[in-house]
From Swiss-Prot:
Gene name in the database record: scpB
Listed Pfam families: SMC_ScpB (PF04079)
InterPro entries xrefs: ScpB_csome_segregation, WH-like_DNA-bd_sf, WH_DNA-bd_sf
Family in the record: Belongs to the ScpB family.
Localization, UniProt: Cytoplasm
Top-level taxonomic group: Bacteria
Keywords: Cell cycle, Cell division, Chromosome partition, Cytoplasm
Lyase listed as a keyword: no
UniProt organism field: Caldanaerobacter subterraneus subsp. tengcongensis (strain DSM 15242 / JCM 11007 / NBRC 100824 / MB4) (Thermoanaerobacter tengcongensis)
Protein name per UniProt: Segregation and condensation protein B
Function, as annotated: Participates in chromosomal partition during cell division. May act via the formation of a condensin-like complex containing Smc and ScpA that pull DNA away from mid-cell into both cell halves.
GO cellular component terms given for this protein: cytoplasm
GO BP annotations, alphabetical order: cell division; chromosome separation; DNA replication
Amino acid sequence: MTQEGKIEAILFAAGQAVKIRTLAEALEVTEEEVRELLKRLKEEYVKNHRGIDIVIFEDKVEMCTNDSYGDIVRKALKMEITQGLSQAALEVLAIIAYNQPITKAEIERIRGVRSDKPINTLLEYNLIKESGRASSPGRPILYSTTEDFLKYFGISSLKELPEIEPTS
């Protein structure tokens, strides 16, 4: 067993970001040694055109797909796309579906929280698109759902969306 292999196994099994300190403790090495191992892994992935990559942000590291393989991954897993969407992304998607075209500011007003990440995720999955600019000051981007949105949810028109129950 190699140290690099151990890191890969831990990151794959975790399925989310892992603290570098946690890796260091598991491998019984220093955090600097872990960072060096991660650097070597990244170099190996690039050199061998691997479909996976590791992303290091501050004190955490996460295994992910290589960006250049994104299209094939999305194509192969399109039926499972909603399983990968966070609750926040699903909320934003519902808001856009029922209120399109809509600006990010309007989405955030409805949700009460920032929505940059969910919007970017939905754009990446091609479930929403930039559909123009509002005429309000600053001309913010308007978002709408895409044809892929309809396909993924098995509907042929937005008219098929269930009616929203009024809140009291």
